[in-house]
Amino acid sequence: MKINNSKIEILIASLILVLITLGIVLMYSPIYFHANDDGIISGLANGQYTGKVSIELIYGSKIYGSLLAVLYFILPMFQWHGIILLSIVLFSSIILFLEISKIEKFTFLYRIGIYIIVINSYLIFVISPTFTKTALISGLTGTLLIYKNLITQNHKVIIPGFLLFMSAIIRPDGFAAVLYFAFPALLYTLYIHLKNIKTLVRYMVSFFPSVFVFIQETYLNDIFGRLPDEWKKYWQFLNAFHQIHTNPSMTKMHQEIAAFQIPGLEWTNVEATLLTTVTYFDPIIFNPSQMELAKNHVNDFIGIRGLLNSEFILTLNRIWEYMVQINYLFYVLLGIILFLLLVIKKFGQVFLLLAFTLYVFFLYYYLGAVWRIPVRINMPIIFMMIISLLILISYLKIRSIKNVWLISIISSVFVILFQFQPKGFIGIQENLIKKQGEQEAISNELKRVNENGIFIGHIKYGYENYTNAYVTRNNHRSLDLTSGWHVFSPPWNQKAKSLGISDANPTFVFTNKKDVYFVGDDYMGQVMGMFL
């Protein structure tokens, strides 16, 4: 009877996810990707820029690019990038439902609370899909299964291995965060099962494919020269840009640029502003040697040197600036950790919880000190830690199980309240409706200026991509490009050259081509005016 009840729970919860998907897609279409990166990925894969499908993706692996290329070639009307992301998150959520249904130690109310949290996490993803969230949700679900298997000594590795692999191929650099969370489990596996070769091999099989893809895409492609020359140059530029643009020291760098304190750097504060806002790249001004100088300058603020140079209180404030955007979720996570510290019986388990909490804090401190923690990274990590801890509680020795259901229900209430905040479902839905109106206005403006006009640069209405996440058809004229760092990508350069533009440079196009124009917001308009 218990098995039947579990199956019914999974069936009902899964049906709710399907209904949520259909309801949101029908009610709010067109749904846009959460970030412009996904719009660019789909544009590269489906041939929007070059007229033919491509396996070369920005931020994605060749394996994922090959899969997308085949699907776009067979059925080009579907936005396969978004559909695959949605399918993986749906599968991950159903796997989480399966794990929740196995919790027999506590009451049904306890399971209800976790079901609600998973459903709310899925709800946000459907209306704002992105490959970063997918990689984290899939990878951290696989990581949860590995930790649970180690606790229960039930060594099933196929599904965890699949989830980790999908995380790695969709976003190799995003998989680094997943690998960070999985690393203690990997060390523990090596320590405990070193003499049990059969079990050790099973776990290595689950880890190896994803880790191999991560290493290959992050390091080996460049070492063994498997990338075409134009893509090598692009990745060299992109990596330099990322270290500069996403670094917390960029404000300080601006001050030093304005004071001419960086030897050899020929930028003024205007060029630095254009670089920081990801709006305009002049291949002459932002040439490889200048980018390298800027990158070397910020090297003192990244990696180990960045941690050593960071100011503790300033970094904590920076972390809180990111965390306050999802503060209700953060409060839930803290509440669960405090609850566990109070109810766990075994000192060893308390010690492990404290050690893992410090381990996670170190990751956030590193990101706050030398990088950044945007919501699309922070939210899925916090959600998955909440869900994972609530599932793993049932496998721990605790003092009393009488009122444990309260922590699950209270957590679910706070998660529901979060949905009414700007970064929750209601806020995202309002922003989506606003963006739909913006796209119509952009389309009308493009038609008014020139039916065949091409927009390059930031639009005054917003900074993200207006690309439909689930179908390729668009009733409005959409933007070819919304982020400057893609200007140097080989497919975009190929498209620009086909239009008679020699260097794909927005400013040269702006001044010399009447059918291509630049629209900026008030601040960027002033900066562009200073430059021109």
What feature does the model see in each segment?
Residues 108-114, 147-166, 197-205, 401-408:
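Short hydrophobic alpha-helices at membrane interfaces in multi-pass membrane enzymes
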Residues 223-308, 476-491:
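Membrane-proximal stem/loop segments at transmembrane-domain junctions that anchor or position
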Residues 202-210, 387, 396-423:
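Signature aromatic-anchored transmembrane alpha helix within multi-pass, membrane-resident enzymes
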Residues 19-57, 69-72:
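Extracytoplasmic loop-helix module adjacent to an early transmembrane segment
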Residues 54-79, 83-91:
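Short hydrophobic/aromatic helix or loop-helix immediately within or flanking a transmembrane segment
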